[in-house]
Amino acid sequence: MKNVKFIKKSESVIGLWLPILVILILFAFLVAESVIMKDIILSNSVVALATAIMASAALVTILVSNRQVQLMARQQRLKAIEDRLEKFYIPLIKAFSSYVYTAQTEDEIETIITCRRYLAGNNLLRVLPMHFKFKADKIAGSANWTFYAKEDFEQWKEALDVLWEEFLEVLKEYYTLSGTEISLPEKPDWLIGYK
C-alpha cells in the first residue's frame, strides 16, 4: 500500500489518449473495410490516407484544445474581475453611499484601502489615500464621514469619483466577458462632508 500512486483523471491513460485511440480505431476500421471489400488500394494511397486522417485529427485536437484554453482564460479573467468588484469596489461604494454605519465600517474601509490596493486600477491608485482619516458624525441626516481637513475631504471626493469611473469600466468588462446585457447603475451621492 505504501507505493500506491493515485492517478488524477487528467493523468489517466484513457482520459489523455482517448481522442487518439478513437481516431486510430476509425482508421483501422476504414483500412479493414477496404481490404474486406477487396478494393485495390496502393500502398502510397494508404499512407496518404493515414497521413490525411492523422493531420485532420491533429487539427481537430489543436482547435478543441485552443478553444478550451480560451474558455479557461475567460473564466480566470471573469473570476479576477469578480474579485475586484466584490472585494474592493462594491464595499467602498457601499461604505461611502450608505447611511448604515457600524463600528466595523471604519476598520473595513481601512483594510480595503491598505490591504487590497492591488485590486484598484492605476488611476485610482494615484489619488487614493494610504489611510482613512475621518471624524464620525452621527447626527441624523448628515453625512456619515466628516473629514478634519479640507485637503482630506477634497482628496476623498476625487478618489470616490475615480472609484466610480473605474467601477463602471470593470463592470462593463465583466458584462462583456460574461455575455450579459449591460445595465449600469446610477452614480450614488457620496456621504462625505467637511467641518
Swiss-Prot record:
It is a multi-pass membrane protein. The chain crosses the membrane at residues 13-32, 42-64. Coiled coil: none annotated. Keywords: Cell membrane, Membrane, Transmembrane, Transmembrane helix. Its main location: membrane. It is found in: Cell membrane. GO terms for cellular component: plasma membrane. The keyword Membrane applies. Pfam families: AF_0924. It comes from the Archaea. Gene3D superfamilies: AF_0924 domain (1.10.3940.10). This is Uncharacterized protein AF_0924. The lineage of its organism: Archaea, Methanobacteriati, Methanobacteriota, Archaeoglobi, Archaeoglobales.
